[in-house]
Amino acid sequence: MTDDDHPQPWTVETWEDGNGRSPFGKWYLKLHEYDQAIVDATIEHVLQPLGMDICETEWGKSLGEGLYELRIRASLNAILNRGISGEEQVSVPGGDKTVLLRIFCTFHGQRIVLLFQGYDKGKDASDKRQQSEIKRARKHLKTWKKEK
């Protein structure tokens, strides 16, 4: 087996503005513990292994101009058992609750994903809220591009 058979996972970083503030970190810390576990599991089991290829699956969507949306609409157990069959599957107590979360990010270089922010689409699925969040993410992306 060669290294090509097991590509290195993508490195995931959280973007901070010039003042050291992280919109993603601020949002993440406000999440319920279960939702934080889902975000962590999605980053580890979906985003890191797939990188940009999330857009070839239900997990990702390109929003244009280098902005991407990581789409989480699954339960913790479903994420943890992704690609696992039968007796090897795990079951976390209470881990069957499905959530609807969005995380905005960009990809840079071969192996870096920058997380800009997120929101709970399950709490407010309105088009107005979604467009507002996308607009804010585009602003963060523009700022990051100027900084790099």
Role assignments for model-derived ranges:
Residues F107-L115:
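Active-site beta-strand-loop-beta-strand hairpin of nuclease catalytic cores
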